Amino acid sequence: MLILISPAKTLDYQSPLTTTRYTLPELLDNAQQLIHEARKLTPPQISSLMRISDKLAGINAARFHDWQPNFTPENARQAILAFKGDVYTGLQAETFSEDDFDFAQQHLRMLSGLYGVLRPLDLMQPYRLEMGIRLENARGKDLYQFWGDIITNKLNEALAAQGDNVVINLASDEYFKSVKPKKLNAEIIKPVFLDEKNGKFKIISFYAKKARGLMSRFIIENRLTKPEQLTGFNSEGYFFDEASSSNGELVFKRYEQR
């Protein structure tokens, strides 16, 4: 079983590391090509392209400039410990045991606009380059054209290595769009998280993102390998709703806290 999650905009390169083990990203040659393109952008162009403040644009221009092809624990940190958005609040990788990291390294992948696919222990230098950004490059008009089949092929390699054919899609639509489902050698299962609001169940972005992290942690902690085991997910009040689910979609609901 291979879990897919999105990266995060918020990064943490200060907190103490809970493991010293690391691996290197497998698609660094591609990342270097994107850095070459990104370095051509001025801070105002970055601000416009990414729809971010001038201050953030300056920070990210500096990140592109400072990026080096040689990754070390001094200039990079493990991706699963560097990302700090809502998904990662639910995942809480900073509390993983070494055995948890082992399982995650085999079964969890983070999709990335710059790095393509990251394993949890892959070193990552700080960046911001969301998958949906229209960064023109030698392969096309945006990052989807740049990555083409590369991400899908890398996921197929991971599936073949574990001898499995199930992908748990906990990534956002923006990121999963970089995967070619018809070329993926797997059944795709998509958990959906609905929270009650004023008597109706709907997707509430913040809660749904955190729930994707909670589900990832549930799979890793319990060493789950079969999709039917996911129905036991009950973290923070969620429960499986079989009536609302279908073959490819597992629906989990949570009542409003009153």
UniProtKB/Swiss-Prot annotation:
GO terms for biological process: response to hydroperoxide. It comes from the Bacteria. GO terms for cellular component: cytosol. It holds the Pfam family H2O2_YaaD. HAMAP family: UPF0246. Belongs to the UPF0246 family. PANTHER family: PEROXIDE STRESS RESISTANCE PROTEIN YAAA, PEROXIDE STRESS RESPONSE PROTEIN YAAA. This is UPF0246 protein YaaA. It comes from Escherichia coli O6:K15:H31 (strain 536 / UPEC).
